[in-house]
């Protein structure tokens, strides 16, 4: 447990900030809930009183979260008002489409029964985006970390569409020439950190895309991550060079579902998928077999130096999650775009919807209240006054608008709030897919670091481990499943990738120590993986006749040639999703790291929603979220099983752990006889009886690489870059 609450006081210099001192209040003094109101002495780095015996006055009080009447209660009823104290309220009468990957082929998903008596029916993200852009009549607004004009959205030869072979760039130019207002905001990465670029972490085509649309009717603005007004020169430099615009949204006007040809409505897309190269994939996640079809002109492999279609696979498959929002919630996404365009878009080119009010209907429900498929949805963000127009100026007004105040900065941190709120309400299980998993550094072991210097303070990992602890103490089952990539995209041996893996190890170790301590206190000697278990995704394919034959070969003795000969590679997990009890889901652009959860670092957007007729109140929820989770599990495991209906049960977690242990052995073995039967692999670490995260025997390095699975602390990269 953290032993002190630490108050840090710095001198606000124009360049940097000098530490004046820190004040400490022992946690023991506040846990009984008594209010503390007193002066506390300031100490230096070595815990000695600073000169002139300075003090600060603090007033604080602790409230035990388990005393909250909503703790562990789930959504409970359709009257659940949403996450409190946020910028956007929860909207009712919405419609949501959930997407696994950019595309799902016909007949991929087996029959998954839902409460309605129907079966789960998957949606197809890029086909729907193509239709939405093609059919827009007034405006198309897009924001992305990256937008690439040369990709095509429709690539399934069994599901052709009229005009489907057009590139995204040509499609947007065509729509703009028809009089549709096309506005694109993409992150300007010209200033981004060279340290990361050389490790293969950034390649966004921002300048190519800007040049492509020059002298066309499409308005494309490169958007730097500008700081708010409050920072020092160094802080401002950090924000503009180290942080990104990460929201991935499309907002269009759309036809009415009832066929009214005169009226239009708003439809929005929110999630993890950028409209750029390397993102199109299906749940098959092939490494070699699509290199002369869907991926011939879209070969993405940034983890090997010099990888190319000419040298052949494996390409890096891409697993991601996205959503389409209809009804009042779609307008909140539109308002977010307008706030950002007014702040950084330059010219005032936004369509004035007031002038179109006889055409575009005002925000109104997309579903009737008694429709069992209706959704309640809330929009969350990580963004600050440097990136969004019209934020209040004072801390008091900010608090009223559900915003928090930083150092002379107003911040929307509601994505983190939404995760924390959902974890605290959870009753039975949590299923997470995320590109990163690190944080709660205040609770990391202080062996070879000073946790207070790391500043990856977001609460999500600690909230998860404390939720499990509370359930162990109550004698109730609770399981957390987390899927992450093998390593963050980039050269796996590089300093930045190894540093992130090191933070991830410290995060997992902190969580496993919490779980093991709770089990021991109950006299249980159980495997902590029965409560908290981590996975990655990978594929391995035998060579088939008629496969694409590359004209060149990778360098000898490279990771690339080794992976090509072993016929294996990770499937990159880029999803940012959490499912709680099959009744509540969060989907967005935000990773589980400080950059995404901070609010004043990367800009992000996410939706959180549930179906009021499909709650886990008396029996398990069996609505769209349940169907979506089982669709994902089928994609990852290559099978479905009755135990999967109760993910919290020991039978389910034991079965999933056994299957994924076997799949990891097949993935990492020297020989290959058949395709891998599923993609979900045990994350290749062990957990000691004390909770230390260790190497799996024989797995110091990821297969085909010299990259350590447990990572390595970086001596030259500041934590602000890699957390």
State what each model feature region is.
Residues 56, 60-72:
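Non-catalytic propeptide/linker segments at domain boundaries
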Residues 535-543, 554, 558-561, 565-566, ...:
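Pan-eukaryotic secretory-pathway lumenal catalytic ectodomains of glycan-active enzymes
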């Amino acid at each position: 447990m953290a032993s002190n609450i630490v108050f840090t006081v710095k001198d606000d210099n124009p360049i940097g900030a000098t530490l004046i001192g820190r004040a400490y209040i022992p946690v023991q003094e506040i846990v009984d809930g008594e209010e503390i109101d007193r002066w506390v002495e300031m100490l230096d780095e070595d815990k000695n009183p600073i000169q002139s015996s300075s003090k600060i006055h603090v007033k604080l009080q602790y409230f035990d979260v388990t005393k909250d009447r909503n703790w562990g209660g789930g959504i409970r009823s359709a009257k659940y008002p949403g996450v409190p104290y946020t910028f956007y309220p929860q909207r009712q009468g919405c419609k949501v489409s959930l997407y696994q990957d950019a595309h799902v082929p016909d007949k991929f998903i087996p029959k998954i029964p839902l409460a309605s008596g129907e079966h789960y029916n998957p949606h197809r993200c890029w086909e729907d985006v193509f239709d939405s852009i093609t059919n827009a009549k007034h405006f198309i607004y897009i924001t992305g970390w990256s937008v690439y004009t040369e990709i095509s959205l429709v690539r399934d030869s069994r599901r052709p569409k009229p005009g489907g072979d057009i590139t995204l760039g040509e499609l947007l130019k065509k729509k703009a020439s028809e009089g549709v207002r096309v506005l694109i905001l993409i992150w300007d990465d010209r200033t981004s950190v060279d340290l990361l670029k050389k490790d293969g972490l950034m390649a966004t085509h921002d300048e190519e895309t800007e040049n492509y649309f020059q002298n066309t009717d499409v308005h494309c603005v490169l958007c730097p991550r500008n700081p708010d007004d409050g920072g020092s020169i160094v802080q401002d430099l950090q924000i503009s060079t180290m942080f990104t615009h990460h929201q991935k949204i499309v907002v269009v006007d759309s036809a009415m579902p009832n066929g009214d040809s005169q009226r239009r409505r708003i439809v929005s897309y929110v999630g993890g998928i950028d409209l750029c190269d390397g993102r199109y994939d299906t749940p098959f996640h092939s490494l070699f077999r699509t290199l002369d079809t869907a991926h011939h002109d879209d070969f993405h492999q940034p983890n090997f130096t010099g990888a190319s279609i000419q040298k052949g696979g494996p390409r890096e498959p891409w697993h991601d999650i996205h959503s389409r929002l209809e009804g009042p919630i779609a307008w909140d996404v539109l308002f977010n775009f307008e706030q950002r365009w007014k702040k950084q878009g330059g010219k005032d080119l936004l369509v004035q919807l007031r002038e179109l009010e006889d055409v575009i209907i005002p925000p109104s429900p997309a579903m009737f209240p008694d429709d069992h498929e209706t959704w309640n949805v809330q929009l969350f963000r990580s963004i600050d006054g440097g990136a969004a127009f019209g934020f209040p100026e004072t801390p008091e007004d900010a608090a009223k608008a559900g915003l928090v105040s930083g150092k002379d900065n107003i911040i929307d941190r509601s994505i983190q709030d939404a995760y924390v709120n959902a974890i605290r309400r959870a009753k039975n299980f949590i299923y997470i897919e995320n590109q990163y998993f690190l944080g709660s550094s205040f609770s990391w072991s202080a062996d070879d670091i000073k946790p207070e210097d790391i500043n990856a303070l977001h609460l999500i990992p600690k909230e998860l481990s404390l939720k499990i602890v509370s359930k162990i103490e109550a004698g109730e089952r609770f399981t957390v499943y987390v899927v992450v990539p093998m390593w963050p995209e980039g050269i796996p041996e590089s300093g930045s990738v190894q540093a992130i893996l090191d933070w991830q190890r410290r995060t997992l170790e902190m969580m496993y120590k919490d779980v093991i301590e709770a089990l021991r206190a109950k006299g249980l000697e159980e495997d902590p993986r029965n409560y908290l278990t981590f996975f990655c995704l990978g594929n391995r394919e035998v060579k088939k006749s008629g496969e694409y034959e590359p004209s060149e070969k990778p360098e000898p003795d490279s990771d690339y040639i080794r992976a090509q000969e072993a016929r294996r590679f990770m499937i990159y997990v880029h999803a940012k999703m959490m499912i709680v009890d099959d009744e509540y889901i969060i989907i967005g652009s935000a990773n589980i790291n400080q950059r995404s959860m901070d609010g004043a670092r990367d800009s992000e957007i996410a939706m959180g929603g549930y179906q009021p007729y499909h709650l886990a109140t008396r029996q398990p929820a069996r609505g769209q979220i349940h169907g979506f989770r089982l669709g994902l599990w089928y994609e990852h495991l290559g099978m479905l099983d009755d135990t999967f209906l109760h993910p919290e049960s020991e039978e389910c977690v034991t079965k999933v752990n056994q299957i994924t242990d076997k799949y990891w052995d097949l993935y990492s073995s020297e020989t290959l006889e058949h395709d891998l039967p599923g993609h979900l692999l045990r994350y290749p670490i062990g957990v000691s009886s004390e909770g230390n995260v260790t190497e799996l025997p024989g797995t110091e390095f990821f297969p085909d690489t010299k990259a350590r699975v447990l990572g390595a602390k970086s001596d030259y990269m500041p934590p602000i870059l890699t957390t």
